[in-house]
Amino acid sequence: MSEITKRAFASSLKKMLAKKPLEKIRIIDITEYCGVNRQTFYYHFKDIYDLLEWVYTNEATKALGGKKTYETWQQGFKQIFQYIVNNKEFVLTTFNSVSREYLERYLYNEVYLLLIGVVEEKAKGIPVREKDKSFIADFYKYAFVGIVLDWIKSGMKEESDKIIERLNKLIYGNMEEALERYRTDKTYSYKK
């Protein structure tokens, strides 16, 4: 029952965001739309921003669908793009409001989870410190999310497949090279 109620609140928020900015939506609007009282809302969420975060972390996380390997990262990234396209009004309203940080947090988290899986897979058999693997995943995370945010900002005009194809050209082989440079059993010398 609790999950159904949360989904009803999420659906109501998404429908309202198609008509007005988040700053203009009140909890009473959501509860009246769902036919429940305010206490029911507060039983599940602290405030509207908590609900917004729940939408991104629960609904959107399904977009990744376990595509966290080197062979499937492109599919995982495509599913993130697809989630954004399928929820365009919701994402754009969030992106263009003070609640943009929730969208960014969602993207950073999902892309990191996708990339750390790839880094871990590629690091098998290579002695690399955990903090260095995390650093590599963070580097790519910031690049990938920056590209996604620019894509959203520009109105999502470019086909996501083309962006992913271009990213693949950049990333192919580079992660392995980075892991080799971070090996703990060898010293890497930089060419000048």
Regions found by a protein language model. Give the residues of each.
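Amphipathic, non-transmembrane alpha-helical scaffold segments
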Residues: S2, K6, Y56, E104-Y108, ...
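An amphipathic alpha-helix adjacent to DNA-recognition modules
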Residues: E3-K6, A10-K14, A18, E23-I27, ...
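Cytosolic nucleotide-binding catalytic cores of signal-transduction proteins
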Residues: K19-K20, P127-V128, Y172
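A short secondary-structure junction motif
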Residues: V55-K62, N87, V91, L114-K122, ...
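Secondary-structure edge/capping motif, primarily at the C-terminal ends of alpha-helices
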Residues: K67, V91-F95, K122-G125, W151-G155, ...
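Helical hydrophobic small-molecule/effector-binding pocket
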Residues: T72-E120
